């Protein structure tokens, strides 16, 4: 289960932090990328690197 605050990586190797859940779909999350932008991403395209408990 992906939670807010988890450090994630996408298929391209970009790192980001989950900042909130999408209002439209329960399988999408908002990610704040280290490059500075943010967008929604389907959870199947993300790998959790560090889980915040």
Q: Which residues does each PLM region occupy?
A:
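Basic/aromatic-rich interaction segments and small domains that mediate binding to polyanionic partners
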Residues: 3-50
């Amino acid at each position: 289960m992906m939670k807010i605050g988890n450090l994630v990586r996408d298929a391209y190797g970009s790192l980001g932090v989950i900042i909130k859940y999408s209002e439209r779909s329960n399988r999408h999350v908002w990610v704040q990328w280290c490059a500075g932008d943010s967008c929604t991403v389907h959870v199947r395209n993300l790998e959790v690197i560090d889980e915040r408990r």
